[in-house]
Amino acid sequence: MDKRLRKTEYFFVFIVFTVFVIVAGKYFDFRITDLHIWNAIASNLEELKLKKEFDTFYINVDDGNMSTSEYAETISVLVYHGLPNTAQSEPDVSKETFKNHLFALKKSGYETITLKELAAFLKGNSKLPPKSFLITFDDGIKTSYYNADPILKILNYNAVMFVVSGFSLDENSSYYLNGDEIKEMVSTGRWEIQSHGYTGHHRIEINNEGSTMPFYANKSWLEKYNRLETDEEFYQRILFDISKSRDQLGSFLSEEINAFAIPFNDFGQYETNYENASNILKGLWDQFFELVFFQFRPVAGYDFRSNYVDVDNNGAYLVMRISIDINTDTKSLVDQINASQSKKL
């Protein structure tokens, strides 16, 4: 009975919109209003389609070993990048795959949280329901917003977008979100905007042979002087990129920017030409941010550590994220997150 009722509701809404289009065409000048009308119609029809797909979606997942605690003991954080209609390579995920990921998580009982809720949980100041998790996106790519938002909307989910502010606010790119789009995202109530650096999301030359390494974790080769940066020059370059992005986004949105996603997931923990890079970065993060995010890939199976309460932490919290890409299977993703819920320190 319930499914028949839903189908009747969908059909009724479709008829209402059809009548609206006919009436609008009779009384309004479509040369002025057609774009807004058709965008609204397309948006609502897509929403109806997604709701119908969700109603019939099914996935069999393993939740037999999950914790039975009344409250969340760990919080899993996912990170996506671009969401093109068809994904060609890492780290992109297709719109269809993303939809299946979120449908499966919703069907499995998972609900999203905000950055504020995550911070309170990590500090031990707040309890969250079991199966709470956070969705994040890096880079501020247009497809991440346009293809994710309709799915977030029908599931009543929210997400965080980490923006490279110099690419979005200082340029009018066809690839990165612009300022108007970012404000539109915030206005939906489904998106939080945070920092992914100013322009430091690129590789820099580290020697006179043209070898390159990530911006944040290495000293830059100064060709003019035929040498590497000094310690102070490195510090000032990183300080500028971090503070510029935080201040630029904060001023633009009139909101506090208190979270940062590490570009290239590299803070000198793997390979660097400056052994003190990670210490300097940690000091700057403690100065400017409450939460700092980095990617984490499980080495084998489901053996990975999620994010736990840490009341003794005195600086920025390092938040581990599960990196999602073109190869991430829907069932294995849900099984991974389910497995993390059962692990205790």
Residue map of PLM features:
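C-terminal active-site subregion of NodB/CE4 polysaccharide deacetylases
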Residues: 27-136, 143, 205-345
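Active-site metal-binding loops of divalent metal-dependent hydrolases
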Residues: 137-140, 197
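Hydrophobic alpha-helical membrane-insertion segments, chiefly the h-region
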Residues: 17-29
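A short, conserved beta-to-alpha structural element at the edge of catalytic cores
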Residues: 158-178
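Short loop/turn segments at strand-loop or loop-helix junctions that form parts
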Residues: 78-83, 164, 195-199
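N-terminal Sec-pathway targeting helices
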Residues: 1-17
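Active-site cradle of extracellular carbohydrate-active enzymes
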Residues: 177-219
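Acidic (Asp/Glu)-rich catalytic clusters
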Residues: 149-156, 177-195, 282-286, 307-314
